[in-house]
Amino acid sequence: MRRIFIPVVAAALALPAAAENISPELSLILQGQYRRGKNVPERAITGYWPAGHAHAVSRRLTLDETELIAAAQLGWSSRAQLNLALHDGKIEVEEGWLQTLGLGHGFTLKGGRFLSGIGYLNEQHPHAWDFADAPLMTKALFGEHYGQDGLQLKWVAPTGLFMEFGAELGRGRGFPGSERKGAGALFAHLGDDVGRSHAWRAGLSWLSTRAKEREAHFEDTDAAGPNEVAGLFTGKSRTVVADFVWKWAPEGNPQQRNFKFQTELFRRSEGGDLACASDVATSPCLGGVALGGLRSRQTGGYAQAVWQFMPQWRVGYRYDWLNADSKRYDPATVFAALDPANATFARYRPQRHSVMADWSHSEFSRLRLQFARDKSMQGVTDKQVTLQYVMSLGAHGAHKF
C-alpha cells in the first residue's frame, strides 16, 4: 500500500502552484533538547514487551526530531499532506495521505499513511505535546504513536453535540502488530461546550492487529552463557482506549489564561505462541524452539493538567502508571530456555511523575524545562531533567482540540 499512496501524495503536492484552487503550505518544525538522567544501556519498561529499542540517554544538547511538512488543498474536493521526520541522519515518512472533502453528509475518506485516530494523543506529533516526552502508556502500547498504512473513513454527525465516528483498515506495520498482517480500528468521540468558558471531549477506541514473530531481546539459560537470544511472539493483540479532555478559558478566550485536563486509560489483551531463536551452538534456543502459548492482559493510563496562568507561561503535572502485566504461560517450558530474571516476565507496577514549565515567545516557539521521577524500570529510580526548545517555521495548521 505504501507503493500506491505515498507517490500519489508526493505527486499531488508537486502540482504547479498556478493550478486552480491549489494553495501549497510548507513548514519546518525544529526540536532540540538537553536531557540528564541515569545512564541505562538499554531501556525497557519492566514487565512489558518492548516496543522497539530505547538506548541510553544522551547527556548533551542534541537536535531531536525535525519535521518537514508539505500540505495542499486540492480544490474543494480533497487535501494532501506529507510529513517527513528527520532524526539521527535518517528520514522517515511519518504521514503521507490524500483526504476527500467533498463526500457530503459529514463523511471524509483518507488514504495513505496516517496517524491512527484512536485515543486522544496518538494523532498529535511530538511538537504538539504538552510535555517533552510521551506518556508511559503510549510507549508501552505503540513505542511513540500508532500509524496506519491504509484507509480511514470518518463521519461527523450534523448535530449540536460533536459526534465523530471512524473506522480504519490497514496493513498493521506498527507495534503491537507486524508487517503485512493487517489491522483494524474503530473510534468514537463526543464533545460539547459547557457555557462560554468550558469545553469537553470524550472518546472510546478499539484496535485489533496481529503479530508474526514479533521480536524482543531475552537472555537464555545456557550454562556457558548467558546469551542474548530473540524472543518471538505470534498471535492476536486487542487494545481498548478511553480518553477524556476538559478545557477552560475565561469567556472562551485562551490567550490570557487557560486550563486543560487530559487523561487516557487502556486495556490490551494478547494471545498466541512464544518461541525463541539463537545461532549460538550451546543455546537452548538454537535454530528456533517453540515455548508454548502466551496470554497477557495489560492495563494502565495517565492523567495530566496544564495551567496557563499568564500570557506565554504554563506549568503542568503528569502522572503515569502501568499495572502489573497478567501473563499465562507454562513456566517449566519457558524457563527451560529463557532466564526467569528477564524483565519482561517480572510482575511490577511502573510509574512516573513529571512536572514542567514552559514559555512561548510566540505561537511559533517554545522553551520548556521538565523534571521527572521515572520508576518504569524495576530497581531504578531515574531522576530526569530535560531542557527543550520547539520552533516552527512557515505555515502550520491549527492543532486539534
Where are these regions (language model features)?
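Outer membrane beta-barrel
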Residues: 20-196, 299, 304-327
